[in-house]
Regions:
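Long, well-structured alpha-helical subdomains associated
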Residues: 105-156
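Active-site recognition of the HExxH zinc-binding catalytic motif
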Residues: 62-75
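Catalytic zinc-binding patch centered on the HExxH motif and its immediate surroundings
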Residues: 25-49, 54-58
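Post-HEXXH active-site segment of zinc metalloproteases
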Residues: 58, 74-104
Length: 156
């Protein structure tokens, strides 16, 4: 004899609907401590902070070059707050991060990092930061096109 199906309890139904009805989230929102270096506005000026646990001098040099690009971008934008407010889309984040990671990549390669692997890693980071992981190959292609080893070299 088969057991008679029992009606789903109200609590079980609410739990099921609560789990099913919530939007899926691939990852949590980023926090400042997630970044090894971060440039933000303080008293209207771009200020960079590197995490205190970053002690490797080679990595610190890379991060300082990367964040210097963001400070220059902010200065060219008119105001730090306006620059930060402009970072509202994946496309805009990619546009801002490409030159910063390009500068960091040049330093890393000069320090002996593998050119291709580092460029690929940086493309993935840009894609993740912008929330556009589906564009990671396109971002890698842009880094290859727009970021020669030496800044005075024309793009291929």
């Amino acid at each position: 004899m088969r057991p008679t199906p029992r009606p789903m309890g109200a609590a079980a139904l609410l739990l099921l609907l609560g789990l099913w009805g919530r939007p899926a989230s691939a990852q949590r929102a980023a926090f400042p401590d997630d970044f090894l270096g971060l440039t933000r506005c303080e008293a209207g000026r771009p200020v960079t902070r590197l995490r205190p646990d970053v002690r490797d001098s080679l990595l610190r040099e890379q991060l300082e070059v990367h964040e210097a690009v963001h400070r220059r971008q902010s200065d060219q934008f008119g105001s730090c707050e306006a620059f930060m407010a402009s970072l509202g889309s994946a496309r805009r984040i990619i546009e801002v991060e490409l030159p910063a990671y390009c500068a960091q990549w040049r330093v890393a390669v000069r320090q002996g990092a593998d050119s291709s692997a580092t460029r690929r890693d940086f493309a993935w980071r840009i894609a993740a930061q912008s929330g556009a992981m589906e564009n990671r190959l396109e971002i890698l292609q842009r880094l290859e096109r727009e970021c020669p080893v030496r800044p005075d070299q024309p793009p291929p």
